[in-house]
């Protein structure tokens, strides 16, 4: 059949996936293995989608068969055992389809078995969100399996809760096929139907005319947080002891054959009435993860506990797993992991005892502590568990979480700025997986938390997977080593891993040799990559820096603004200097022109003085001539004739001989007569 071939192909791909997972544990930094792992996960997802379509087709066929009146009998699929064996390692889509398919059977058989005895075990569970199922996959091994079969894949029991129904459950767990009959009797509003599918085949019989079936659709919760770096794997191994006490339940009506699997009991109580020793579940301490005690807590003040004990052939310790829902819309998983290398003794489950209530704190004391900034021990544990909060992937099986093998994230820039150590002591490369300094987390009590809800002021119930180690306390992962880290895993230049230098302002990392220019030593203090430096200089986009980085970058922006203003002032100063030089040159030119003008003025004034002196001489000459004319009128004619004749005139011989004295004056007068006329 097509479904069987798909399951075989899925089985082969899952085996290859497990081999790759083992190789990734040896070499978690290998990029090729990561690529192969992602491709293999894509193949598995595609196969699961095909199987989903096949299951939907089978469901349609069942609906068609249901429409036939009078006789209707559901035949078990021959591949049910194979599906149950491979369900643990298939993705969440396959688990959802199988759960819907089995719930389809359960609703059909619900109307066929209304006559159940009162001695059979009744199960009630608290209401959950409409159209949301919570798959819980647990491994169980039988006590009669031979030693050669112990290593094979164990049986899987699936617990499915569907809204708006409440059923009475009757199970007989045997080595033979399990007959599972449920009644549609409604015992209370808001309750839910619970179905348990065990190993081998499931036979469901319906004799009355069927009713239309409503199949709930699963809506995966939105991913509000990034993928976790580590998810614990719930794999309880078989244990040898078969005398594990469990909270008592009404005895079954049928003759009890030898039990292959221990009975499954679900109890419900509210925090107002604390459980007694008969219906309470003692929390089991974890050594190396064997028997699982799973407590599921709801914030509606109701608690549903599921206890499953799995006997086996080997001696091992118990294991405690606690699940809760912090809100009605999202589920978070917080993991505390502590390794245990030496197991000195195997622990067994003690008889059930009532869990201790949380210590009552005085409200005035709490208010005083809050005003001082102090916290109580319970609040401290809550804060430390919140620091390790991780978002679980949509796959219910943690084996398929691809985030398990992602590389360790590096410290964020806020860590370096908030740290009190010297900035030069920052080391290159990836920080260690576990912090060397023991924090408060290592000093918390290793005993598991009580199985009842918190006090009313702490209505937020937390989801924890607790694996405490009893021998040696190993420090918890540093809360700052992975929380809020945004850095990449590979060098931004060569895209390879190794010892990387992280930028304190962005998510990029670099090798020292890949930088331009390359660095020889680790820079002290805050280091900014070249891209961030260019970005801050260009101011292409504003980056909202968180926390202390906002102060740093505001100072950087202030310095950049001051530097820019300084550059502007320097440029202005240089422009002014250049303009001054030009003005000085103009001043020199003007001074030269002024000096030339002054020289010309001086020359003109000198010539003017000379002309004035010459005029004075002419005037004196004229006066002399007038004086000669008055004294000697005879000679005046000759003098006037000499003046009128100019330089070419020659006095007569008698005049020259008779008046020799005025002859030089007449000569000077004739020499300057023309110049005097010009000046006049």
Swiss-Prot record:
Pfam families (alphabetical): PHD (PF00628)
Expression tissues: Highly expressed in brain. Expressed at lower level in other tissues, including heart, kidney, liver, lung and skeletal muscle. Abundantly expressed in fetal brain.
Superkingdom of the source species: Eukaryota
Entry GO terms, CC: DNA repair complex; histone deacetylase complex; nucleoplasm
Stretches annotated zinc finger (PHD-type): 488-535
Biological process per Gene Ontology, one example term: negative regulation of transcription by RNA polymerase II
Phosphothreonine modifications at: 350, 444
Region annotated Disordered, chain positions: 82-118, 318-363, 440-463, 639-680
DNA-binding region of this protein: 425-437
Consequence the record notes for mutating residue 429 to S: In IDDBCS; uncertain significance
UniProt keywords, alphabetically: Chromatin regulator, Coiled coil, Disease variant, DNA-binding, Epilepsy, Intellectual disability, Isopeptide bond, Metal-binding, Nucleus, Phosphoprotein, Repressor, Transcription, Transcription regulation, Ubl conjugation, Zinc, Zinc-finger
Biased composition (Basic and acidic residues): 327-345
GO molecular function, one term: DNA binding
Biased composition (Polar residues): 444-453
PROSITE patterns: ZF_PHD_1, ZF_PHD_2
Region ranges (Required for transcriptional repression): 486-680
The UniProt record lists the keyword 4Fe-4S: no
InterPro entries in the cross-refs: Zinc_finger_PHD-type_CS (IPR019786), Znf_FYVE_PHD (IPR011011), Znf_PHD (IPR001965), Znf_PHD-finger (IPR019787), Znf_RING/FYVE/PHD (IPR013083)
Residue numbers carrying Phosphoserine: 447
Localization per record: Nucleus
Main location: nucleus
Residues forming coiled coils: 558-603
Disease: Intellectual developmental disorder with behavioral abnormalities and craniofacial dysmorphism with or without seizures: An autosomal dominant neurodevelopmental disorder characterized by impaired intellectual development, developmental delay of varying severity, impaired motor skills and language delay. Additional clinical features include macrocephaly, obesity, overgrowth, craniofacial dysmorphism, epilepsy, and variable behavioral manifestations including autism and attention deficit-hyperactivity disorder.
Description of how the protein assembles with itself and partners: Component of a BHC histone deacetylase complex that contains HDAC1, HDAC2, HMG20B/BRAF35, KDM1A, RCOR1/CoREST and PHF21A/BHC80. The BHC complex may also contain ZMYM2, ZNF217, ZMYM3, GSE1 and GTF2I. In the complex, it interacts directly with HDAC1, HDAC2, HMG20B/BRAF35, KDM1A and RCOR1/CoREST.
Name of the molecule in the record: PHD finger protein 21A
Organism expressing this protein natively: Homo sapiens (Human)
Organism phylogeny: Eukaryota, Metazoa, Chordata, Craniata, Vertebrata
Gene that this polypeptide is encoded by: PHF21A
